[in-house]
Amino acid sequence: MIGDLLLFGTLLVNAGAVLNFKLKKKESQGFGDDLTEATTGDNIREFLLSLRYFRIFIALWNIFMMFCMIVLFGS
């Protein structure tokens, strides 16, 4: 059960980290647009962009998960 949850989380983070399309911001219309609150789409875009910077750590986590799957969760 725990192994399945760890595998699910790992695959989900991997999917977010390897997305390879352009995530563009909205065009600003004037000086007053800087004061608006960030939308949910903006927050998701920022999260996905931050995942791209952590690809090396995600790769190390994948290696660790493979080790755990063989040693701890294997039969």
UniProtKB/Swiss-Prot annotation:
Location(s), subcellular: Membrane
Alphabetical keyword list: Membrane, Signal, Transmembrane, Transmembrane helix
Membrane topology per record: Single-pass type I membrane protein
Organism domain of life: Eukaryota
Positions on the Extracellular side per record topology: 18-53
InterPro entries: SMIM7
One GO cellular component term noted in the UniProt record for this chain: membrane
Cytoplasmic-side positions: 75
Membrane-spanning parts: 54-74
Keyword Membrane tagged: yes
Signal peptide stretch: 1-17
Predominant location category: membrane
Family: Belongs to the SMIM7 family.
PANTHER family to which the protein is assigned, alphabetical: SMALL INTEGRAL MEMBRANE PROTEIN 7 (PTHR28622:SF1)
Name of the protein described by the UniProt record: Small integral membrane protein 7-A
Lineage, highest ranks first: Eukaryota, Metazoa, Chordata, Craniata, Vertebrata
Record gene name: smim7-a
